[in-house]
A protein has these predicted regions:
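Hydrophobic helix-and-loop "lid/oligomerization" segment in the mid-to-C-terminal part
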Residues: 2-23, 31-60, 70-77, 158-292
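Active-site cofactor/cluster-binding pocket
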Residues: 63-119
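Solvent-exposed alpha-helices and their adjacent loops that cap or buttress functional pockets
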Residues: 72-75, 96-99, 113-114, 144-146, ...
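Short glycine/serine/threonine-rich phosphate/pyrophosphate-binding segments
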Residues: 27-33, 88-91
Length: 292
């Protein structure tokens, strides 16, 4: 029996299911979580929760987003599924929900994943967890309709930077073609996720732009935002999305570094690279992880 067969067996057995993802979730985390949530509900699993304590408002248009919970009083779920999460520690405040579940599953695409579930379906060659989820849902023979497809597309668009990051393959576009056939509006979704910004997000991005510094003969770009910036511009979770990519888009830059201050939690460092530097290995040295 394959790993996916075993996971689907656990899904069928479970009376209660919780879907979790990493803190400070991006579009791949939110989109893939909601795709699974919607697919399981459509399949007839009624007792399913998706918990995302701080979901960026950018993704409020996604089907099922109104059902996202900030917390849950359920102590012991039959099945916990961690999505787009490379390690147990990345679950942060939700780690106990995962740990206390009868059975745990991990669905992910990070090469640094430490296989922390009872069952792990991980493909480090996939540029987005949404691609891994498409494979899983197809293996489960669960329907991918327009609504679920929209959630999956958000995941792919986000983690590929609009199809411009390394790791994008012919299969990526084949997956997107399949979603198009389901009626998903690619141009509208792309615009909502990557092009439309709130005024607060625009101001936060402008502040970061004004602080960019270069090192190593212009090969490294660095910028940051502070708690004071968040307060000044009334910025919220998710408003920082895309800032780390600004430096990488500048000619000659190989590595972009973005640091943001998080209230009560210190500093969060994000790294992005072009082809020559594997930044996930650098992040791993400091307890982080991810992909180039």
């Amino acid at each position: 029996m394959s790993t996916l067969d075993k996971i689907f067996e656990e899904i069928n057995k479970a009376e209660s299911i919780v879907i979790l993802t990493h803190e400070n979730p991006d579009g791949d985390a939110v989109g893939t979580s909601l795709a699974l949530y919607n697919a399981l509900k459509l399949y007839g699993k009624n007792n399913v929760d998706v918990i995302i304590p701080e979901c960026p408002k950018t993704f409020n248009f996604l089907p099922g987003s109104s059902e996202i919970k900030k917390e849950s009083n359920v102590e012991n779920y039959d099945l916990a599924i961690a999505v787009d999460c490379a390690s147990f520690d990345m679950l942060n405040g939700l780690s106990k929900k995962f740990e206390d579940a009868t059975t745990t599953v991990v669905i992910d695409h990070h090469g640094t994943n430490n296989m922390f579930g009872d069952y792990n379906f991980v493909n480090p060659d996939a540029p987005a967890c949404a691609e891994v989820m498409i494979v899983a849902l197809s293996a489960f023979k669960l329907e991918i309709n327009k609504e679920i497809g929209t959630c999956l597309l958000v995941g792919i668009i986000t983690d590929t930077g609009g199809f411009k990051y390394q790791g994008v393959t012919a299969e990526t576009f084949e997956f997107v073609a399949g979603l198009l056939r389901k009626g998903v509006n690619v141009s509208d979704t792309y615009r909502k996720v990557l092009q439309v910004k709130t005024k607060s997000a625009f101001e936060l991005t402008r502040a970061a732009n004004n602080r960019i510094e270069f090192f190593e003969d212009g090969k490294i770009a660095y910028t940051y935002v502070t708690l004071e910036d968040y307060e000044k511009f009334n910025a919220v979770a998710g408003d920082h999305e895309g800032i780390v990519d600004i430096g990488r888009d500048i000619e000659g830059v190989e590595v972009s570094i973005f640091i943001r201050e998080i209230k009560g939690k210190g500093l969060k460092v994000s790294l992005r690279s072009n082809d020559k530097v594997n930044v996930d290995e650098i992040a791993l040295l400091y307890g982080g992880g991810g992909h180039p």
